[in-house]
């Protein structure tokens, strides 16, 4: 009925990781012309380090992180923000190689799925992807960059996300 939340038994969830069609999606993109300019490697590294620290903070301080978002005046309420952060955290953590370090096997799978699906006609050139900046950003971080002990919490999603 209208206004009722869906329950897990109402859904058929397909985990694309289980069927070999998962694709990497979230990334930081820059143009080759920008990153090749003097000093921009350092800017990118600092940006990644700050981003990683932010996600580590949100992993370890869910309530405070949700409150930061609520203070910014989102259109959705607290339970939605809490649920969303819990789900995003589960996508990031654990990160066995460290947050932001791309898994080469998953990258290769992403390329293969994109080629098979007609999104790409050929694999990107070897220089299209860089992982050295994420690795350098991790070197400057104190704290748990792998989140090995992370586990999702139970979040009650209220009608309308309130």
What is each model feature region?
Residues 36-121:
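Secondary-structure end/capping motifs
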